[in-house]
Amino acid sequence: MSESSAINGNHYEQLHQGRTKMYKSKVAVVLGAQWGDEGKGKVVDMLASDVDIVCRCQGGNNAGHTVVANGTEFDFHLLPSGVVNEKCVSVIGNGVVIHLPSLFDEVLKNEAKGLQHLENRLIISDRAHLVFDFHQHVDGMQEAEKGGKSLGTTKKGIGPAYSSKATRNGIRVGELLGDFNLFSDKFKSIVATHVRLFPSINVDVEAELARYKDYAEKVRPYVKDTICFLHTALRNGKTILVEGANAAMLDIDFGTYPYVTSSNCSIGGVLTGLGLPPQTIGEVIGVVKAYTTRVGDGPFPTEQLNDIGDLLQTRGFEIGVTTKRKRRCGWLDIPLLKYTSLVNGYTCICITKLDILDTLPEIKVAVAYKKPNGEKLDHFPGTIAELGAIEVEYAVLPGWQTSTEHIRNFKELPENAQNYVRFLESELSVPVRWVGVGKGRESIINVH
């Protein structure tokens, strides 16, 4: 090797080591492993007590997370669940789309329940896009036009807002805080575009501009460059927790398209929604409900349209936080979980709502998908037609038929409940670190 090559090689190594050492801490990520409603908020609330910053990276107020803290139940849609911890900062990242009226309504409702000092510990990205009322009207109209083939959206305007972002005529929070004349021009332009496409929507432009002039001053104290903020925090050794909204099977790329949401709710959305490089990611925690639920339409291989489904729905109080719709219920689905683990790279798992299975004499778990000819699939189907045609192979595990609700030590769980957890762990080759047996943060059992 020539002297210059050796020098260049050493220079590369020095630069590489410098880049890898520039961050003193790693980011932990909490992701839903199914179709949402797994209990991510409770897991984030538990972990937030030990972190400095909690972030939302994608989605909007179509997400719904419930946290029970000190006997009070908080419902969050845009605010990160970690906001109940007064010692940490909450960040709404650039990948989130924000309906400001809903955000401030959510703040008021939760302040009435005891949430305090939010103005000192909430930061909103100046690059986050805005959801306007007309986006919500368009969302509802598009769903109505589909009739019986609707996608079951929350009608919160999330899809139309991301569409505006993708077609490059959306408006960012930072633009609202800049020259208001420029904001007004952009707002009039985006309204004109939507009225042209959807003539029946009615927007009082001047009234909306007056309203958003007020919102500009209300939101201004919260807004900053969150990318710089987060990178500075990592270089200073601050601990960061990211709360994924929705779930892997609702991801726009990896979910059961088109019955999905409009953002990337898998690990990739964490990076693009916060401006973080891959080497900053440490733990990736997959949250898995002990059975499977889904809100709205779309394929659901293990759905139980019978007494089992009714029991899970009733015992689990499976009502959507955002939509108030009953969730569809079915057995745990290992092929689905293997697929989302493949995409997200879970380093550990938290199983929630194990206690809902307490009364069952036996519990089924999907372990394989089969084609109509009986051939086992070695991949997760890429189309809803293929997924709709599969047959499910189940393993049958014995139940435990005793209450687990007040148990706080894994070894004190009934043997069959422990076996259920170990079965999932073995099938996925991912360690189960926590098991939830109730609503409060104290009901999460540390397995190891």
Curated annotation (Swiss-Prot):
* A single Gene Ontology CC term: cytoplasm
Q: List the disulfide bonds.
A: none
Instruction: Give compartment(s).
Output: Cytoplasm
Catalytic activity entry? IMP + L-aspartate + GTP = N(6)-(1,2-dicarboxyethyl)-AMP + GDP + phosphate + 2 H(+)
Q: Which pathway, per its entry? A: Purine metabolism; AMP biosynthesis via de novo pathway; AMP from IMP: step 1/2
The entry assigns this protein to a family as follows: Belongs to the adenylosuccinate synthetase family.
Protein name per Swiss-Prot or TrEMBL: Adenylosuccinate synthetase
Q: Which organism is it from?
A: Drosophila ananassae (Fruit fly)
Its organism's taxonomic lineage begins at: Eukaryota, Metazoa, Ecdysozoa, Arthropoda, Hexapoda
